Amino acid sequence: MLSAIAKTLTQLRKLGLVSLIVLDGGQVSSRKLLREQSWRVQQAIETFGEPGSILLDQCIAEAESQTAQTKGFMPSGVYIQHPHLLLRALRDNAIVVVPPVTMAHNMKSIDVVDADETIIALTKFFCGLQFNASESPVGAPDSSLSPGAKVASVEKVIILDPAGGTPLSDAHDDSCHRYINLDQEFEGIMYGLTHPTGSEARRGKYPENVRQLHARNLDLSKKVLAMLPSTSSAIISTPSAAANKPIQQFTSVTTRNRQNPLIHNLLTDKPVFSSSLPLDRVRSGKKGDMASGETHVATLVKRGMPLTVYPDPTISAWVPPRPGGPRLRLTDTCIDMPRLVNLINDSFNRELDVEHYLERVNENLAGIIIAGEYEGGAILTWEKPFDLDEETAYKTGRLVPYLDKFAVLKSRQGSGGVADVVFNAMVRGCFPEGVCWRSRQDNPVNKWYFERSLGTWKLKDTNWTMFWTTPHLPLSDPKLLDYENVCRYIEPSWADTKPPD
């Protein structure tokens, strides 16, 4: 496996990404073991030819206490010494191996240090954030490095751990998050890892030590990405996944999981499978399939963007308000209506008839999802079948959860995962029991909808296709007739005369 991982790293180098490797030997690690394993890694890389690999086992030093390195932004007990050696190796396109061993600032001892601290110190150095690490730094200073100057561009942080990607708390197997939007999800995921539910603990789904590993890897990702541009990302995966061949002949969709997540992410800046795809769409589906164990072993992590949801489903579940009772409206002060209208107009490439739209949705609004600074969003409503009055629909439980508008700014479409973030918030947080919507049959976005819905229906004598995410809904269920009734008769609200979207 080591040779296969070394090959992946050399292929990443050919694609423009030069790696720096920090080994983590665990709590029982010794200086001797780390140096031996570092040498093995170096030799494995060297077998793939020039420019090879360089082992630098003296570039980490212990920082003196009460300095900016130990007390300032993102504190670390170690710092980078002999930076000219490190930079020379990287300029030569060599893959650098750095064992987490350090010499004390008094030059009297050499100790094993925490690998995460080493990674944080390296990131601070590359970002130009290493200040006053020692009053008397060891080694010759590099006069070309001015304080605060960015030394190198860190594009990816790759964490290879047998524990694999960050697990999904609500999955019944070992599936993991495919994408984590830190701004939105970090606190909730960390809480789930550190406070497992009783049923999970009883089942022994994830032992305490494994959950601690997952929490540590995610916390490290957050700390490192906090120092990097928003375009940088972290990948948490297994060594075996990193050893996969980057290119294979695929005979069916179910084998796509065997793609190398490192190569795939570098080429696309996306996870192997979109985070908004239903789990069943990306599982192998065949017991005994050798690939099934690798279905969800990689988690892509980004700083992402904040997500605002009104009303907040973590406080109270979305339920239909009583007719005549208080409810959220698009004209409420918490919603920036001009920016919302701009988002819709830009995404649909047509102008919304605002007055007509407000008349139609303001009294049956279920909620609104806003990604970032109105870069994406969704407007959801409670719709009554057109042959019922609101009171009857409410009392009989026939109000339909409906996705009225799903919009992403053109500048954010196809990148950044904005659509995935909004869609996941809708189906996991706001309407976990299902939501329906409609789209023109010739809409190019329909492929994306087909992949994420749990059912579709072409509405006879119309140009509409209806989609829904309601689980376990047979075609004989009368609920589908209510869905169809709503999707068939919703009146569009555009200021132009083009066919409705």
Regions found by a protein language model. Give the residues of each.
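Nucleotide/pyrophosphate-binding catalytic subdomain
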Residues: 1-241, 330-337
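Fungal intrinsically disordered, low-complexity polar regions
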Residues: 66-84, 137-147, 171-175, 188, ...
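A conserved beta-strand-loop-helix scaffold within acyl/acetyltransferase catalytic domains
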Residues: 332-414
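Terminal substrate-recognition subdomain of acyl/acetyltransferases
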Residues: 262-263, 270-333, 346-359, 409-410, ...
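Structured beta-strand/turn binding interfaces of compact recognition modules in eukaryotic regulators
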Residues: 24-25, 160, 383, 406, ...
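Short, aromatic/basic amphipathic alpha-helical patches
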Residues: 36-44, 247-257, 447-454
